[in-house]
């Protein structure tokens, strides 16, 4: 007689084993209709799985995040159902849930077209609208293998042979005549899977290995209701308009080319933004009392072996040989900073020692993962390392956290999600070291009243880390900042200081990045602002235009004056109509467009309008320059009169 305890503390007693669906029905028919699955003693279970002992139960509906993930996973099965009806010869590989949706990798000789995807989506919807029940059957390993062998599903057989123990009892989910294998849970009925859209098709190697066959990957998105689906599709349309690759080309900020995959060619205006970010971070480094250093781009393999990178990170490192020595181009800056720390005797009085670098790093990312500025092979990190004592860890980590929040606020990012990544399988150091490091970061977060979630196994190989994920105007998540605690690397590389009792001690090392990759952060900013950078970041802050040739000399004088004031300004003296010039520079997203005619020249004024078409009227040249200088100095996010 299981006693079921619900989240509100109430209890319900049943004479026989019950399913989550039974409990939901006992509470009310409305809840039963909405029930997707159950969380039984903290573990997600199918709505029809029987509960045989006293348990805590939370009923999962489409209002829960887990409910939406489950229906997305079931939509992947629905996609498989439809594909097998339309192309029975298809061999199904894997169909997991991803952010906002799902995909299925399929082996099909016929290359899917846009028209095929539209037809496939219609077939999926027609199937879902029959509201058929999804039937789960738990079978033996051999029964599962026989089922897929009879259907010629070689990829499912490979998964069973290579990934699932023969003692296991896999779950097969029956979608009418279609069968799929999964840990689950899945929806009990396809009425939950009617708000979806197939998005695209791409190539994907089986198991992500380029030595294997290239499959077709069909992507889809799925939501709890029509409104949520529509909102997401509108957001995607807006994201496409803001695509940094498109805007970067329109504004002539940078380019990339096949001869240097994953490497950025910065053009003048893009490099201007890069330098402004560097300048801003340098000011922050001064406020928080950092040294700035510069380490070599390439170091001997021996050093990377001592640091542990060669063993744990070699596949991501570019290497070269010279005079019978093997070198690695640095993927990160930390080993170099330890070498700088090791020069000269350090005392406890020298700690904390905060060392920062705009470090040029390279990582051998897979070519298929490269994506504009967001995923590159060559990048610049606003990297820093703090060498301190155990007693200083809490204060130093707290200062790093405050620096992250101060910096993000300047760009208008105030929705920050914090995650704590803990020890991975491949790591250096013993469990005691990892316990101390993880506990120290947890305490620092608690001291700053910061809510966080734990990401088990996602830490760096040398230490746990706090990850700061900012959410942009489209509510997309971008993981940028990190604060990592490291007891291992200083030991491996022989870093020591003289303690107060004259003993030699190993410092604790805090790894800290705020923007992360400057290249990636610029990509994020391009999309956040849709190319309309705040004045302080804008490559060109002011453009001055004449109406006739009579004002040309005065316009050049104005631009010279602005440049002397530290304002990035240019002139447009072309023999074009003023409306044409205004439109062109509006498309270039220049914050301020200044027009000079005879009257403005006579009165030493400028007619000012913003890139958004707001007419600020006529202003004295000195007054306007003072306003702009203040905007730049304050790093204001808004233009005048906004």
From Swiss-Prot:
Binding site for Zn(2+): 334, 385, 511
Entry's cofactor comment: Binds 1 zinc ion per subunit.
Database matches in InterPro entries: aa-tRNA-synt_IIb, aa-tRNA-synth_II, aa-tRNA-synth_II/BPL/LPL, Anticodon-bd, Anticodon-bd_dom_sf, Beta-grasp_dom_sf, TGS, TGS-like
Primary site of residence: cytoplasm
Keywords (A to Z) from UniProt: Aminoacyl-tRNA synthetase, ATP-binding, Cytoplasm, Ligase, Metal-binding, Nucleotide-binding, Protein biosynthesis, RNA-binding, tRNA-binding, Zinc
Gene3D superfamilies: 3.10.20.30, 3.30.54.20, Anticodon-binding domain, Bira Bifunctional Protein, Domain 2, Threonyl-trna Synthetase, Chain A, domain 2
Listed SMART domains: tRNA_SAD (SM00863)
Alphabetical list of Pfam families matching this protein: HGTP_anticodon, TGS, tRNA-synt_2b, tRNA_SAD
Cell location: Cytoplasm
Subunit architecture: Homodimer.
Function (record text): Catalyzes the attachment of threonine to tRNA(Thr) in a two-step reaction: L-threonine is first activated by ATP to form Thr-AMP and then transferred to the acceptor end of tRNA(Thr). Also edits incorrectly charged L-seryl-tRNA(Thr).
Protein name: Threonine--tRNA ligase
Gene assigned in the entry: thrS
């Amino acid at each position: 007689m299981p006693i079921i305890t619900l989240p509100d503390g109430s209890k319900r007693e049943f004479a026989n084993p019950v399913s989550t669906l039974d409990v939901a029905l006992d509470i009310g028919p409305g809840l039963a209709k909405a029930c997707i699955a159950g969380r039984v003693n903290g573990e997600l279970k199918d709505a029809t799985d029987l509960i045989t002992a006293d348990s805590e139960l939370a009923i999962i509906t489409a209002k829960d995040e887990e409910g939406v993930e489950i229906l997305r996973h079931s939509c992947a099965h629905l996609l498989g159902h439809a594909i097998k009806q339309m192309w029975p010869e298809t061999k199904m590989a894997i169909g997991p849930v991803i952010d906002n949706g799902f995909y299925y990798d399929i082996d099909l000789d016929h290359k899917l077209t846009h028209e095929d995807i539209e037809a496939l989506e219609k077939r999926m919807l027609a199937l879902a609208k029959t509201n058929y029940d999804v039937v789960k059957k738990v079978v033996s390993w051999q029964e599962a293998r026989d089922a897929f062998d009879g259907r010629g599903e070689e990829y499912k057989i490979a998964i069973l042979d290579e990934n699932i123990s023969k003692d296991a009892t896999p779950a097969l989910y029956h979608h009418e005549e279609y069968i799929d294998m999964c840990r689950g849970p899945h929806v009990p009925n396809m009425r939950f899977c009617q708000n979806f859209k197939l998005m695209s098709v791409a190539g994907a190697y089986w198991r992500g290995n380029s030595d294997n066959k290239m499959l077709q990957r069909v992507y889809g998105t799925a939501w709890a209701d029509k409104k949520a689906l529509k909102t997401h599709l509108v957001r995607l349309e807006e994201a496409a308009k803001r695509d940094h690759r498109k805007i970067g080309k329109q504004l002539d900020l940078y380019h990339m080319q096949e001869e240097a995959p994953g490497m950025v060619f910065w053009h003048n205006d893009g490099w201007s933004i890069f330098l402004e970010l560097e300048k801003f971070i340098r000011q922050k480094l001064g406020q928080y009392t950092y040294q700035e250093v510069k380490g070599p781009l390439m170091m001997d393999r021996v050093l990377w072996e001592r640091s542990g990178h060669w063993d744990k990170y070699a596949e991501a490192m570019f290497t070269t040989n010279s005079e019978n020595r093997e070198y690695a181009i640095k993927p990160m800056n930390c080993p170099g900073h330890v070498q700088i720390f090791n020069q000269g005797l350090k005392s406890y009085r020298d700690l904390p020692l905060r060392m920062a670098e705009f470090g040029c790093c390279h990582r051998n990312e897979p070519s298929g993962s490269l994506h504009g500025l967001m995923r590159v092979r060559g990048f610049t990190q606003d990297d820093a390392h703090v060498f301190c004592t155990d007693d200083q860890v809490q204060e130093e980590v707290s200062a790093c956290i405050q620096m992250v929040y101060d910096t993000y606020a300047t760009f208008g990012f105030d929705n920050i999600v914090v995650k704590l990544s803990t020890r991975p399988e491949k790591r250096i150091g013993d469990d005691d070291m990892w316990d101390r490091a993880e506990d120290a970061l947890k305490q620092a977060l608690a001291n700053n009243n910061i809510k966080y979630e734990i990401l088990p196994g996602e830490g760096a190989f040398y230490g746990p880390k706090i990850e700061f994920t900012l959410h942009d105007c489209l509510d997309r998540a971008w993981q940028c900042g990190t604060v990592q605690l490291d007891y291992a690397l200083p030991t491996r590389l022989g870093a020591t200081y003289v303690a107060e009792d004259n003993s030699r001690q190993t410092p604790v090392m805090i790894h800290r990045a705020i923007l992360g990759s400057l290249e990636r952060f610029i990509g994020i900013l391009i999309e956040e602002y849709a190319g309309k950078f705040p004045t302080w970041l804008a490559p060109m802050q002011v453009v001055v235009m004449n109406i006739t040739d009579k004002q040309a000399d005065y316009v050049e004088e104005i631009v010279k004056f602005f440049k002397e004031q530290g304002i990035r300004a240019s002139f447009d003296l072309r023999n074009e109509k003023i409306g044409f010039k205004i439109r062109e520079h509006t498309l270039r997203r220049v914050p301020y467009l200044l027009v000079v005619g005879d009257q403005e020249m006579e009165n030493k004024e400028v007619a000012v309008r913003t890139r958004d078409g707001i007419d600020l009227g006529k202003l004295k040249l000195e007054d306007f320059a003072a306003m702009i200088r203040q905007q730049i100095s304050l790093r204001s996010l808004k233009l005048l009169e906004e």
